[in-house]
Each structure stands twice: as C-alpha cells, then as structure tokens.
Amino acid sequence: MPREVKKRGRRAAAKRAEEEKEDVDLKVYENDEDYVTFDADGGVAGGHDDEENDGYDNETPYNPLDLKQMPFFGFLDDQESEYFKTAESTLAVDAFGSPEEKLGFISGLLDEARGKELKLVTNQICSKLMERLILLANDEQIRALFEVFSGYFVDLSRHKYSSHCVETLLVRGAAIVEKEVLDPNFDGDSEDSMEKRFLTLANDMKDYIQDLISNPYASHVIRVLLLILGGQTLPSPTSSEGNSSVLRSKKSRTARRNIDIKDSEENDRAYQIPGAFHDALEAIVSGFSKRLKPTAARELAIGQVSSPVVQLLIDSEATTSEQRPLLNTIFADTEDRDSSEEAFVEHLLSDAVGSHFLQNVLQKAPEAFVERLYRLYMSQRVQKLVRRDYAGFVIETCMQRLPEADVHHIIDTAMGEIPYLVENNNLTMVRILLTRAAAANYKATDVANAVLKTFDTDSTDPKLLQKVLQLDEKNPYKPHEASSPGLHRCLVLQQLVEASPEVLATAFVGLNSGDVDVIKMAKHQSYSRLLEKCLRPSINTIERRKFLNKINGQCVDLARDPFASHVMDRLWNFTYKMNNFREKIANELVADEDLKENTYGKAVWRNWSLDKFLRRKSDWWVTLHATDDALAKEYEELGIPLDAKSLANPGQKRFGRGGARIITRGGGTFPRGGGRGRGGFRGGRGGAPRGGFGGSDRGGFKRANGGDGEDASGDRSRKKVRNE
C-alpha cells in the first residue's frame, strides 16, 4: 500500500515531534459563559484532578498575570471560515459599484459576525477581516464592538492576531470620544458614552500593566492606550516619520506595511479628551511606579519589549506628577553617587536598548537631572565613551542639554579620538561631533580638518571626494546596507559639505572629474543624498555647467528613478541664473508624454511647474525669476552673494559705466545680472549680435553639432550660455 510521504532528516523529525507535542485537543466553546483560559500544555489553567476543586482560587485576584495562559474562544466551522475568508478578499479588492453597496456589505458582515467576534479576532485570516471592518464601521458599530470586547481586553491584547484589532478599535474609539467632548448636547455621564468605556478599559488594564508591557503584542496596545489617555499624537502604524517610533519599532512598521490594510484617517493626529482621561493616566502611572522596586523597574527599562513602554510612562509622568516617582525609582533620588545606579548607567551606556532608553530620558528629563547624571557618571570618561558604538547617541543628547562649558569639554576631548573612530569605522560619533561642533559654533573648522586629515586629504585636495568615499574598485555603486562603512562615509562627507563651503566646492570638483559616474550616483540610495547636498547655486558657474552637461539627455531617466528624482528637484535651484539650461531640461522632460504617469516623474513634473511651461510659458518664466529672486535674498542673508560667488570665478570683475562685468576665459564679457542687447555675450574680436555665440576660435564659442552645446574641440566645459 502507498506509504505516507515524510520529510527526511533530523531537523524534520524534530519538527514533527514538536508539532505532535503541541497537537492537543481543545474544546470549542460556543458562548462566553463557557470561556476559560488554557495553559501552555493545552490543559485548563489551574485545573486539578480533585473533582471537589473547580480549578480556580477565588480568594486570590488574577494578578500577576500568568503569561503562559493564553485565551481561547473556539474555532469557526469550515463553512463559516470559508465565508469570512471570502469576505476578507472582497473587502481587500474593494471593487464595489458604489459607496452604498460597500456600506451594505459591511453591515451585513457585522450582522453575520454577531456572536462570533471573539473567534474571528483570534483567527489569523479572519482577524484581518475584523480589522478592516473596524476601520470601516460607523460610530454605533464601534460602540457595539467595544461592548463585545469589554471584559476580554486584557486577554485579547496578548494575542498575536487580536491585538491588532484592539489597537485599531482604540484609535477609532478615540475619535468618537473627541466628538462627544465637542458636542454640547451630549451627556458625558451616560453609560453609553465612549468615555465611560475607555475609563473601564483603563481600570481593567491598570492592575496588569507590569505584565502586559513585557508581552510583545500587548505592549503595543498599552502604548496606544497611554497616548490616547495623554492626548498625544497617534502616529501611523506604518509611517517612519515624526514620532512613529513611540508606537512601533522599525521592524514592526515594516511588517505592518506588508499587510494590505490602509491606515485609518484617525491616525497621525491628537484628540481632544475629557479631564477624566488625565486622572486615569495618573492612576496607571502612579500605580505602576508604587508596585515596583528599583531592581524590577530597571529590568523593565532595559527589556527589549518593555523599554519603549517604560519610556512612554516616564514621558506621561511628566504631565501628571511633579514628583516624577517612576523616574526617581529607576534612578537614585539623591545628589551623591550611588553604586547600584552607577552599575545600571554603565549597562545603559554599553547596550543598544539601554542607550536608547537613556537617550530618551535625557531628552525630556529636567536639566538638573541631566547635569547630575553627566557629572557623576560620564564627565570623567568622555574619552572612553566616545569610542563605544552605543554611548555616542547618549553623548550627543548630553551635548544638546548641557551648559556650554561641558559641551566644549566634550568636543576638546573627542577631537583626539577622531583617528581611532575613523580607523574602527565608528563614523556615527564622527558625524555627531561634526554636527554638535557646528551647532555650538565651537572649533567646527578644526573638527572638520581633523576628520579630513584622518582620510589623508584636506579641503583643497581635488581627490577629496574619492578619498573620503573610498569607492570599491570592482563595484563602486553597489547598494549600501544599514551598517555598511560606505554608507557612513557618505554620511560623514554630507556633514562635511554642510559644515564647510570649501569642502563643498572641492567635493563638487571631484564630482565633475572622470573618476565618478554622476548618473549612477544619482540612482544610488546613499550617494543621491550626497548629490542633493552638493547641488547648490553657490557653486562656481563653470563647474555647474560641467555637471549639467554630464546629465544632458538623461533627465527623463533620472526623473523616473525613486532616488534620482530628488536630484532632479534640486536642479531647479541649482540652475540659478542659467535659464537656458532650465529651459533645455524642461523641454527634455515634457517631450516624454508618459512621464506624468510615473510616480516619481509626476513629482518632478509638479516641482518644475511643467504644466505652466506647456500652457502659459510666460507664467513659467515669472515663476523662474521669482525663484531666482528668493534664492538671491536667502543667500544674501547667509552672507553669500550668489552673483559674485557663482559668476566671478575664475575670472575677475571689471567696473565701468555699464556696470559690473565678468571677464570670461575666452575674453568675452557679460553683465553680472545677465540680459540681452548691450549686456549680452560678446564673442572674440568680432563678437556676435544680441548675446549670440561668437564666431572667433580665439575669443568666442562656437555652436557645434547643430547647437547641442559643445564647442568644436569637444570640451563641454567651454560652453557659451545666454541668460534669458
């Protein structure tokens, strides 16, 4: 007879044994009266063989929470499961003929799910359906779901699938609370109010906070609850902008993006809340801090799952209590050095999670607290701390909060460690040092020169860009990983370019050399940002022409790229007073009829005002000149007059009755402001009328290849340009 197909090998055998161990018979309970919890072995939690004992100790409250006990609400039968899976697919496709049809479908689904909600939210596929329904339900349907989940929130929050539904339900509920607060006719004391439901939920959660914040699923629910009770902004669960890390880690946000469920409109905003919410938040924070001893509190503070919630509790404490009991439990409430606190701080400075916790605390703690920690445990050890991978972020935060004298001491001490940091690829600390020195206006040039010296270069070296980036000879433009040394070298160079105009000018010369491919750099996820930093209108005009000639004919391709499209956006300002280049780029972009259909090309089209360029070109020129005027004013406030900075080099100024003029390499002149007629370009000895191209080989520039912008010798840098 046929034999059962089995996987061979010890790993497969071990996996089968594990599955058989977990394969237990679970009784299906059809109503809430039969609901019980099961332990890790599949048995009834607290059950005994003694028939006289019902398995529960009614004298002891359900606290602390046994994390091994997981809720079980039964299974759907095959027919129900198939029906709801099909419904989930229908909602995901969203191919309804009208909004009314969709609303009717949602109402029918909620009616069909009545009595089965707890089974649905704990099912892998059906929980996605319930989350979609929660997002699409009206206010009355949200209230009804709150009522169904009431009494089960603690257990549902700990479940892998239902926890997402609880989070979404809380966000939808917060929007309803705001409506009730803003409605003058609403009775806030009504038992049907969403405010009462939230207060009941907060009271149920209060006694289990210590256990829930250590659960990988419930911790996210607690974060949402704390943000709502505190009236803080609720970040999007998928966005990486703003304070999104308060709600989810980067890994968690990525996982949520992979689920095809759109964010609720209630995300990314704060809500008006009743005063009772502040009282509930204070009760949670004070109750949590009173039950904890310093050792337990510190363990939670460095826990990978619990640490973000403890940070949020400390932030919430600042608005509910002036005494800061939780902060004073984790850290010693004394001015003197404490041995246990010293060991704890040492661990924080050496640990990834701990350093993030300490950084967050120092950002929002009172200045006296920051100065005390720095004075007792860090001031004498700056030289060692800057060498650590994780302590650098803490040092950065200290430099933002400490007095000027302490900041100067850190910079002076850390400068001597720059060679060690570069040699060991700890370039994060190098970037921090560059940033803070510039912000403090203290030895910023000295720090930049020390960094360049470590890379065996200086601000006048034409090979500066190549020496700092250290491009791989075999594959110089391979994608960078998050921890790639190439990425961090690129970030260091960006910081140097930001800090020093001399480094900017020298690095741009490197871009125009034949050693780098600017097209590939523009399409690189890291180097494209470096290009954006370098594309400034203060760059010498001749160097700008060289760069623009390098990308000639590639603009459409760059505009369609997710990274290079940002470079194309920067070209609008980069081409200051180079109107013919702007017009040439615009013509190249509008020649591609499908560019607007591309996601990135559409953004470039909008930023270059190409609709105006096609329909009302005069308006486009007005926009262009307004941009130039704004840029000139902006750079003048920075002490960089763009006309003199960008047009004077490498020639010299000539003053006369006609105003300031620049002598070009070829001997021709043009006015500083640009224009037509008498102020136009003059060619060689004969010149050319009205700003045309000169015909003399010696003094002027020739049109070559039918006016494509190259002279007869093929030198693309010697290109004659006419300002419109």
Swiss-Prot record:
Q: Where is the composition biased (Polar residues)?
A: 235-247
Stretches for region Disordered: 1-23, 39-61, 235-258, 649-724
Q: Which SMART domains match?
A: Pumilio (SM00025)
Regions of biased composition (Gly residues) lie at 665-698
The residue ranges flagged as biased composition, category Basic residues, are: 1-14
Record localization:
Nucleus, Nucleolus
Database matches in InterPro entries? ARM-like (IPR011989), ARM-type_fold (IPR016024), NOP9 (IPR040000), Pumilio_RNA-bd_rpt (IPR001313)
Start-end of each Pumilio repeat: 147-183, 204-239, 291-328, 340-375, 376-412, 513-549, 550-587
Say yes or no: keyword Protease present: no
Molecular functions (GO terms): RNA binding
- What's one Pfam family here? PUF_NOP9
Keywords from the UniProt entry: Nucleus, Repeat, Ribosome biogenesis, rRNA processing
User: Does the keyword S-adenosyl-L-methionine feature in the UniProt annotation?
Assistant: no
SUPFAM superfamilies found in the cross-reference section: ARM repeat
Q: Which GO terms describe its cellular component?
A: 90S preribosome; nucleolus; preribosome, small subunit precursor; small-subunit processome
Source superkingdom = Eukaryota
The UniProt entry's sequence similarity note says: Belongs to the NOP9 family.
Q: What does this protein do?
A: RNA-binding nucleolar protein required for pre-rRNA processing. Involved in production of 18S rRNA and assembly of small ribosomal subunit.
* Name of the protein described by the UniProt record: Nucleolar protein 9
UniProt organism field: Yarrowia lipolytica (strain CLIB 122 / E 150)
